[in-house]
Amino acid sequence: MKILVAEDDYDIALTYEKALERKNYQTTITSNGEDCLKIYNDEMQKRTLNTISNHTYYSSLSNDPPFDIVLLDYIMPHINGLDVAKEILSINPHQRIIFASAYVKETLEESVKCLNKIVELIQKPFTIDKLINTLEDKEIFAELQKLNVDIDMVKAVNPTHEQIMDLLEKVRPYNTQEPFKLF
């Protein structure tokens, strides 16, 4: 798994790095939002810039993001985590983003709604096991991405009350009281 981490607290970043490397994850650590965006853009460019017979062309953007996960602190120097997430999702809306923050959960949840994309939150402090479990839980993220697409389709077709209720029944199993929520 390839993970980009933006965390301004050196000790926390070091803890993440050691734990993720023990799991054999390829981890890139940055200490601020500006560096995080630079690394993300560089990796994205590597994916989209191809050279054939000394001719350079840009391939169409892939749905395949350059990192499996971008793990962001919410409050960071230069550019905050929310603005980093906005920029990344504008480049690749399929990128999985997880906020790891001690910021007030309700305020953070309200803030990330403006992204209009699926992002995850893991509330600090948390155990390394909780972090690893969140990172490895790809199935829930994939299902929620699918539901996000379904919601966009629902908006486009102007559904009946009965159709909305049917969709709510499908979504109900994902309504959990875990320490982190998906938006």
Residue ranges of predicted features:
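CheY-like receiver
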Residues: 141-183
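Conserved acidic carboxylate
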Residues: 7
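Alpha4 helix (beta4-alpha4-beta5 surface) of REC/receiver domains from two-component response regulators
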Residues: 83, 90, 103-121, 128-133, ...
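Active-site residues of response regulator receiver
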Residues: 73
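Acidic catalytic/metal-coordinating carboxylates
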Residues: 32, 80-84
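Charged docking surfaces used in two-component/phosphorelay signaling
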Residues: 14-18, 22
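Receiver (REC) domain active-site loop signature in two-component systems and cognate sites
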Residues: 76
